[in-house]
Amino acid sequence: MISKTEITRDWLPRYTGTQIEEFGNYILLTNFSNYVSKFADRFDCKIKGKGCPMQTATNDSGLSIINFGMGSANAATIMDLLTACNPKGVLFLGKGGGLKQSAEIGRYILPIAAIRGEGTSNDYLPPEVPALPSFKLHKFVSDTLLEYGQEYRTGVIYTTNRRVWEWDEKFRNKLISLSAIGIDMETATLFIVGHANKISRGAILLVSDQPLLPDGVKTQELDKKVTGKFVDMHLEMGIKAMSDIDGKGEEIKHFGY
């Protein structure tokens, strides 16, 4: 019978156009092609995987970035495929909707946990298992955000499979009752599949809209403004954190699973 290792070692290059040995020890994950382009421009490195489902770039210091696409199914796929190269740490640079007044547009959220509303993660671990980041990785990322003078927010993220829900009053009321600080489509899946696969993981989420407010739903114009004003800092902090963690951070995988 073919093993999971055999599958992922064959599929990681197929999905990304990148050979296993070309990935760095630390990985940035994103949903957006412009993050990969900005990374490649900054480090003068080649973008691989054009024409593939996922695109990557890796700098000379051993930091890789991967655009894995949108949604929990893609999040689970990349966290499975990354077992082929066994990274030391993975940091998700995602966007999400702010569900509380304190989660204003342009704020960064460091999620302490995620509610598993997407369903995908149920194929990996029972519903009773909480979706959590790796503490030591998040602790170091927190220090990095403070270095950049960012007054970040922390709290619980609700992860859903629904992209078009803003019109649904019943769903909106459910979100309010859960007291989550934000909503996205990937974080819970990344945390659970990372835990199942013994991969250290974390996330910095950029608040890109406030969908519970009357005029807060993301539009093309709003997304363009958020991208122009906040994305460079988002990427910069991710690069800084995952570049420095080997030398400055505590060992992030010193414990046994």
Regions found by a protein language model. Give the residues of each.
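Metabolite-binding pocket within alpha/beta catalytic cores that recognizes anionic/polar moieties
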Residues: M1-K139
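Non-catalytic positions within long, well-ordered alpha-helices that form the structural scaffold/packing
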Residues: T83-A84, I176, H195
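Active-site rim beta-loop-alpha module in soluble metabolic enzymes
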Residues: E128-L178
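Short active-site-adjacent structural elements
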Residues: W165-E166, F191-V193, Q210-V217
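Flexible, glycine/charged-enriched surface loops at secondary-structure junctions
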Residues: K46-K50, Q150-G155, I245-Y257
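His/Asp/Glu-rich mid-to-C-terminal helical/loop segments that flank catalytic regions of hydrolases
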Residues: L213-Y257
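A C-terminal functional module that forms or caps the active site or interfaces directly
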Residues: I181-Q210
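Generic non-transmembrane alpha-helical segments
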Residues: F140-Y148, V193, M237-I245
